[in-house]
Every structure is written in C-alpha cells, then in structure tokens.
Regions:
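Sec-dependent bacterial lipoprotein signal peptides
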Residues: 1-20
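Short, flexible, glycine/charge-rich loop motifs used to bind or transfer phosphoryl groups or to couple energy/partner
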Residues: 10, 29-30, 74-76
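Mid-sequence acidic-hydrophobic segments that form the walls
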Residues: 14, 108, 146
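A structural "domain/chain start" motif
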Residues: 16-66, 148
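C-terminal/domain-edge helix-coil "capping" segments
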Residues: 21-33, 59, 114-148
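Generic recognition of short, well-ordered alpha-helical segments
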Residues: 53, 57, 100-102, 134
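Surface-exposed short loop/turn segments
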Residues: 64, 69, 74-126, 130
Length: 148
C-alpha cells in the first residue's frame, strides 16, 4: 500500500511539473489600449493551417473585448477619428514528446500601422491539445490584464 501512495505521488508530481505556461505582454510607450473600441480581422494570421481552430478561438477572445467591424466600415470610422486595432495572430504547435504551443498576437493601429502591443504565450502539457489549452488560457489572462 505504501508503494501505491508513492506511485500516485510521483505521477501527480510529474503531471504538475510537465504542465506549465508562460506569457508576456509589451505595450508601446504612450499607447493607451482603452482608447480603442473597434477591431478588424483580416488575413494577418500565420502559422500551421491545421491550427485555424486555435486562431478562431483567439479571435473570439479578442472580439469579446472590442466591437468587430469590416474593412469597409473601418474607412468610415477612421474618417470620424475612431481608433481601430488590427491584430496579427500566429499560432505554432510542436508535435510529439515534450512539444509546446506558442501564441503571438501583435496589435497594430489600423489607421497608422503603428505597433501598439505584442502578447505572447506558450503552453506545455501532456498532449498537443493540452498544450493548446494551456497557451490559450495564458493568452486570456494576459488580454484581461492589458485590456482593462
């Protein structure tokens, strides 16, 4: 029985140490993300086409925080002096033993093309889907933090 508890302890410990995330955000000096109300999505996404579902999940997270507009509507909003964010999303997932999932979102001002913020996260778990969930949760937390 003692060996059983030792085995359970070792398995739980290995799971805890094998699942981790990291994230980082850098906001351009003088930029105030609270001034932005709108976001436009386009063809700015890169990465493995097999990860389009992850890109859609990230777009959904961004859309929860801004009003999504079309590129045609952007021109009208810009003429009224509105600020619009345009994100570039990159997702990469290493397959195999000890793989990682990396997410990078670069926000730029649609009107000026100036870089506003870069958010990065990574996740490592027991499976590829676990890696992705960990990285997505890290991105959610970082978005919440910088888009208050």
């Amino acid at each position: 029985m003692k060996n059983f508890y030792l085995l359970v302890f070792i398995v739980l410990q290995s799971i805890l140490f094998n699942s981790c995330s990291s994230s980082n955000a850098v906001v351009s000096h003088g930029s105030d993300l609270s001034k932005y109300k709108y976001v436009v999505f386009g063809k700015e996404s890169t990465g493995d086409r097999e990860l389009d579902d992850m890109i859609m999940l990230i777009e959904n997270e961004i859309a929860k925080r801004f009003q999504v507009v079309s590129t045609q509507k952007c021109l009208e909003l810009l003429s009224f002096g509105e600020l619009i964010l345009a994100p570039s999303i990159n997702v990469k997932s290493e397959k195999g033993e000890g793989g990682h999932t990396y997410i990078t979102i670069k926000f730029h001002d649609y009107g000026t093309s100036q870089s506003i913020a870069v958010i990065k996260s990574s996740g490592i778990g027991l499976t590829v889907s676990h890696d992705q969930k960990i990285a997505l949760n890290a991105i959610r937390k970082k978005l919440d933090k910088i888009l208050k």
